[in-house]
């Protein structure tokens, strides 16, 4: 049974790495004053490239195109007045997983999210027809309560410890309690994400989530990184996306929790080249802070 599942995941991953035969066909319906506004899709590169564009007419739009594989894209509705230079300040925007399938969009021009975050914009684009997007939304729902609790604890830490500390009022005991609470919630979110990756190793959503672990903002051990690498390698093989992931994983292992520090060469205040190990006292805990310019 295990071998059968491995073969199935491998087939799905190969389909991802290879070009798909079908194109995407998006039809949309937007409520509110939107006549003549431009709707476009941007890829996830830097700088992002526009892959398709159309104009909203009678509250509707339609566009067709083809992508090599499912991936994370951005939709934009440009509300810049006619005759004015387009500006991100006038964009409505959101991200989703695009695939070559028939997809529908529905939204309200008055409530859709803006390019720059606006807490008053609480609406969302309703997207149907992309199985990859459905899986992504399912994953977000699975960690929604944990994420909500984490954000709440973070807000409490800000109000009860951080801001008072700016006035030299240190609620240390409460700060420690909340810091531990945040750390525990982070641990649970990491574990839930790892479970999702292991349950869906052939999905680009899982590969993307694993990739986010390697950005340096989430603390993983070298063993956890190795485990993720092995899970994904079994179904992604030498696909370019997997090759890129492996390279980042090897770099991440060097700065993972428990890994020996990199004994890099530095310049001391006198301009002399020294090894990092020469600057560290023995038998003590040392906090290092690096600034780049």
Explain the meaning of each model-derived region:
Residues 243-278:
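N-terminal "domain-start" segment that seeds a small globular fold
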Residues 209, 264, 288:
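Conserved hydrophobic/aromatic pocket- or pore-lining residues that grip, position, or stack substrates
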Residues 139, 143, 175-193, 197, ...:
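Short amphipathic alpha-helical coiled-coil/interface segments
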Residues 1-28, 292:
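Bacterial Sec-dependent N-terminal signal peptides
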Residues 48-49, 260, 284:
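Short, small/polar residue-rich loop motifs at catalytic or cofactor-binding pockets
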Residues 275-293:
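Short active-site neighborhood of thiol/selenol oxidoreductases, capturing the structured segment around
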Residues 76, 88-91, 104, 112, ...:
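N-terminal targeting signals for export/organelle localization
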């Amino acid at each position: 049974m295990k071998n059968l599942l491995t073969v199935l995941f491998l087939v799905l991953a190969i389909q991802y790495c290879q070009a798909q035969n079908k194109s995407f066909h998006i039809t949309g319906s937007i409520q509110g004053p939107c006549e003549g506004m431009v709707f476009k899709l941007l890829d996830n590169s830097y700088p992002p490239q526009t892959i398709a564009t159309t104009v909203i007419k009678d509250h509707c739009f339609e566009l067709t195109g083809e992508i090599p594989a499912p991936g994370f894209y951005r939709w934009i509705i440009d509300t810049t007045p006619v005759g004015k230079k387009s500006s991100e300040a006038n964009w409505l925007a959101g991200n989703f997983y695009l695939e070559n399938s028939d997809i529908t969009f529905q939204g309200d021009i008055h409530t859709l999210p803006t390019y720059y975050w606006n807490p008053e914009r609480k609406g969302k684009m309703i997207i149907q027809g992309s199985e990859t997007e459905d899986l992504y939304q399912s994953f977000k729902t699975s960690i929604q309560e944990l994420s909500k609790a984490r954000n709440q604890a973070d807000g409490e830490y800000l109000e009860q410890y951080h801001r008072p500390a700016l006035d030299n009022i240190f609620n240390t005991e409460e700060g420690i309690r909340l810091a531990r609470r945040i750390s525990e919630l982070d641990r649970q979110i990491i574990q839930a994400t790892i479970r999702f990756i292991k349950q869906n190793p052939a999905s680009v959503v899982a590969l993307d989530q694993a990739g986010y672990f390697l950005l340096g903002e989430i603390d993983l051990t070298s063993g956890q990184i190795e485990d993720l690498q092995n899970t994904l390698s079994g179904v992604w093989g030498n696909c370019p996306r997997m090759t890129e992931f492996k390279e980042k994983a090897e770099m991440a292992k060097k700065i993972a929790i428990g890994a020996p520090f990199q004994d890099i060469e530095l310049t001391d205040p006198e301009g002399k080249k020294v090894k990092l190990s020469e600057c560290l006292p023995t038998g003590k805990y040392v906090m290092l802070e690096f600034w780049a310019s």
